[in-house]
């Protein structure tokens, strides 16, 4: 259910978020829009409006999955603990190709992120909470901050393809179920060298390549979270080449 101008009153503060997306009566997504024709409007103003809602009508965000902000030109999504710089665009509607710059970012986000299948998948498998400790050097007081993190579009599509490929390689998917599936397409269609067909049960899941700073550790967490459900709680072995990566990955998984 999508509601326009949904009114929320809390502590005598009536507020009307532009769009609220409900799933089974639960407000999971809040969308704040600004008018592209207004020269004073910006996507940052939409973010600030969300911050105002969080302060004045916090109960609206009790079960919130994520929020979307847009000024009509740009459109980005983030969690309720994300700073403005952590809000990210959803750049593909199908995970195959990046959307054309001629297509509205909001349209791409709605088609790629807010369709029923992707939305529920994001809620269930691609949102995590990370706790960080910070000690005051003067008082010695330790504060623990909890940050809610959500997969970016490249992590979402990469992890789901990795899961599909792993299930195929392990023989968990029957050949007839692969008919028309993207895991059976040739890597050559992406300009990569590869075989024409990936047989079921060949024990070759493949390689996921990420650039530096693109969230490799979280992608591993998302992948592990999905694969343990699909494959009857398998053992996952993580191999690193540096001690600092051991600590980093341990903290991320923990």
Residue ranges and their predicted role:
Residues 238:
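Conserved SAM-binding loop
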Residues 241:
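Conserved H-loop
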Residues 1-235, 244-254:
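ATP-dependent helicase/translocase motor core
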């Amino acid at each position: 259910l999508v509601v326009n101008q949904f009114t929320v009153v809390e502590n005598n503060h009536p507020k009307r978020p532009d769009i609220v997306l409900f799933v089974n009566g639960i407000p999971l997504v809040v969308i704040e829009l600004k008018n592209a024709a207004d020269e004073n409007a910006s996507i940052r103003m939409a973010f600030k409006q969300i911050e105002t809602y969080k302060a004045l009508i916090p109960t609206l965000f009790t079960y919130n999955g994520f929020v979307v902000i847009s000024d009509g030109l740009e459109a980005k999504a983030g969690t309720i603990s994300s700073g403005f710089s952590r809000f990210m665009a959803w750049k593909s509607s199908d995970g195959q190709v990046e959307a054309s710059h001629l297509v509205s970012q909001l349209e791409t986000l709605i088609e790629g992120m807010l369709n029923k299948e992707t939305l529920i998948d994001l809620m269930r498998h691609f949102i995590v909470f990370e706790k960080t400790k910070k000690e005051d050097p003067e008082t010695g007081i330790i504060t623990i901050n909890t940050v809610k993190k959500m997969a970016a579009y490249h992590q979402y599509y990469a992890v789901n393809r990795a899961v599909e490929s792993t299930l195929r390689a392990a023989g968990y998917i029957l050949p007839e179920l692969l008919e028309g599936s993207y895991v059976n397409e040739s890597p050559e269609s992406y300009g990569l060298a590869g075989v024409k067909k990936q047989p079921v049960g060949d024990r070759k899941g493949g390689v996921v390549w990420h650039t530096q700073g693109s969230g490799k550790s979280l992608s591993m967490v998302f992948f592990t979270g999905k694969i343990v459900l699909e494959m009857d709680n398998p053992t996952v072995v993580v191999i690193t080449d540096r001690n600092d990566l051991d600590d980093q990955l341990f903290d991320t998984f923990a």
